[in-house]
Amino acid sequence: MASYFDEHDCEPLNPEREARNNMLLELARRVRGAWSWAPGGRSLFNRMDFEDLGLVDWEHHLPPPAAKAVVESLPRTVISSAKADLKCPVCLLEFEAEETVIEMPCHHLFHSNCILPWLSKTNSCPLCRHELPTDDDSYEEHKKDKARRQQQQHRLENLHGAMYT
């Protein structure tokens, strides 16, 4: 039996391709506008922010730092004597009894001197990559778009599977 797309002589939507085409069109519009009234034809073009255009490919770049408010609100936990044999996964030193450590939402424990510099560079747990929110709007939008694409793909697979059952 032929697939839905074969029967209707069409191809499935490719959201990444469509988004890339839209970004390139927007870039062309901005370049054309910047060159048309920029003195000397260069100053506005040099100041264009490619992040504003959504041209940053987050799949191939490091994620931004965790949001400062989120990092400040991470719970501080006092190590009990029963947990004193646990080690910080970053520095590999054992926690001391009654020491205050930072607990990530994934429940991994870290010395504050170990995890805070890490979270100032990236937004995830160094062990399991559980992501914290960021202050970067374009990255947060990328995460939402990625989740929507995954949901759409899942619905399409379910629909396709339902056609043959």
UniProtKB/Swiss-Prot annotation:
Tell me a GO biological process for this protein: protein ubiquitination
- CDD domains xrefs: RING-H2_RNF181 (cd16669)
Pathway per the UniProt entry: Protein modification; protein ubiquitination
Q: Which domain of life is it from?
A: Eukaryota
What keywords is this UniProt entry annotated with? Answer: Metal-binding, Phosphoprotein, Transferase, Ubl conjugation, Ubl conjugation pathway, Zinc, Zinc-finger
As its record notes, the protein acts as a catalyst of:
S-ubiquitinyl-[E2 ubiquitin-conjugating enzyme]-L-cysteine + [acceptor protein]-L-lysine = [E2 ubiquitin-conjugating enzyme]-L-cysteine + N(6)-ubiquitinyl-[acceptor protein]-L-lysine
Region of interest: Disordered: 136-165
Q: How does it assemble?
A: Directly interacts with ITGA2B and, as a result, with integrin ITGA2B/ITGB3. There is no evidence that integrin ITGA2B/ITGB3 is an endogenous substrate for RNF181-directed ubiquitination.
Say what the protein does.
Answer: E3 ubiquitin-protein ligase which accepts ubiquitin from an E2 ubiquitin-conjugating enzyme in the form of a thioester and then directly transfers the ubiquitin to targeted substrates. Catalyzes monoubiquitination of 26S proteasome subunit PSMC2/RPT1.
Record's protein name:
E3 ubiquitin-protein ligase RNF181
Source organism per UniProt: Mus musculus
Q: Which gene encodes it?
A: Rnf181
